[in-house]
Amino acid sequence: MNIEPKYYDNFLEEHIAQLIDMELREVSWQYDYDSVKNGVNKHWHVFIGHDEGEIEDFGYHISMVWNQIKNKFPEYKLERAYLNAHTHGLEPHIHRDDGDVTFIYYPRMDWKPQWGGGTSVFDENYNVTLHAGYKGNRIINFEAHSLHQAQPVSRECYQLRTCIV
């Protein structure tokens, strides 16, 4: 499988994106998640599920992200879904995911570009092959085994940088 890392803006209809943004503001986040086994940098995390039923049970509007992925990319199957988040001062590790393809959806519609918090994808020599700034209603995708990292959030930002993976 050879997938070029890409991002897509306006992934969902505007009103659905707004509902997802509001739904995620009500989530009870859990801190202390490792993206790298025994890593020192932790972040906020909530597991959603391993199948479509579990995703829908978690939140109807969040399931619409998977439904749109399925419509646009029918060749992929859901392995699991979860929420990640971090704030200023938390710097996630460069890491790889398991599975075939990773999709990351940015739900915060009020996010300002100067706050940072995007995602960078790297080649094996740690050169950036894609940097996608954080923008509400944007989704990025890349091969799951690709090195990638959520980017730091500016100290001027007092918001939680959230994403659906």
Listing of model-derived features with the role each one plays in the protein:
Residues 59-165:
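Catalytic core of non-heme Fe(II) oxygenases with the double-stranded beta-helix
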